[in-house]
Amino acid sequence: MPRQLLLRRIRRVVAIAALLGSVATPVLAQAAPAAKAGESCSKSQVNKKSGSLTCTYSAKTKNYTWVAAAASTTSKKNWPSKLVVAAVPSENVATMTLRYKNFVDVIQKETGVPTTFISATDYAGVIEAQVAGRADIVFYGPFSYVLAKARGAKIEAIGASVPTATTAQGYYLSYLVSKKSNTSINALKDVKGKNVCFVDAASTSGFLYPTAGLLKEGIQSTEYSSVFAGGHDKSVLAVQAGTCDAGFVYDDMFDILLPQRGLINAADFKVVWKSGQIPNSPMAVRKDLPSDLFEIIKKTILEKINKTSFVSMGLCTNEATCNVIEDATWGFKSVTDARYDDVRQVCEATKSSRCR
């Protein structure tokens, strides 16, 4: 074979081999740069990990950032095998259990302790559960919280419910409602000789403040027939059914919740009395829990149990439809026991045996 032809063939083979080599050898994709603690991340990345970092949303700063998992400073020594969340009954048990699902899930996630929700059939049952140490975290009414403390519950009010993120302290009202068609009841004094629905003997807006209002009008409990409905919703529904001539209820239950659910037509009712401002309800935690666990629960309730955080965690699609514990609650703001001294003063004014 001529030398030149041989050289051309050798060059062709070398070229083909080089081409095949470049195809066969994969080009390594350049790795994405690792996230650094404190750097910004996005809403779509929340709760996702990059190495040892997690994309976290802060309701305080309203920023998404990569955060390193804190080194465990707790041994979890003497921690309970489970946590129990409870609440005084404002509605039926099934509805309340559903409403507290996200709350329970977040407490369980942040503490790592299996968490369940219970709702007793009356306020006394919830108070007794926390006095006996069978309930760890309880959402009380102001009066039932005062009663629990007075009866020996080792608890601390760590947060009170607020309707918006910008509300420092919230208040609510007690209403007395009657059917519009009932022309005999147009004011608080008109309950004489009538069947009156209260909620529970340990309810703030469903008993204590109404009782104080009646006494201020000079009306004694012997001058009307008391019916304890067992829930704020049940009080209004009993008026609707004609079981009671009038009933006491907290404002948002009547103004928002019952109409939203189609259970009443507000136009069929009239509000014949409103109380003064009542400090919003507290979330109380057992002080005899291990201190490190107590602090985790407190931090979680104040920073992560709110509509803004629930949306960022993917538990809600938006704040407008998000439920924390009830539709009217955005979340919780720090509170102290002294905030409920007004409730204690109302108790003193009524001289009611229920206050003991």
Segment roles from a protein language model:
Residues 1-31:
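Secretory targeting and sorting signals
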Residues 32-43:
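Secreted/surface-exposed cysteine- and glycine-rich disulfide frameworks
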Residues 49-57:
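Extracellular disulfide-bonded cysteine-rich modules/repeats
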Residues 77-86, 91-102, 285-356:
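An extracytoplasmic/periplasmic, membrane-proximal ligand-sensing/linker region
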Residues 85-108, 120, 143, 166-237, ...:
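Bilobed "Venus flytrap"/periplasmic-binding protein-like clamshell domains
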Residues 114-121, 137-139, 222-231, 270-273:
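Short beta-strand-to-loop elements that line the ligand-binding cleft
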Residues 139-153, 212-216, 240-241, 245-266:
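A ligand-binding cleft/hinge motif common to bilobed small-molecule-binding domains
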Residues 155-169, 222-225, 258-277:
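Short beta-strand->loop
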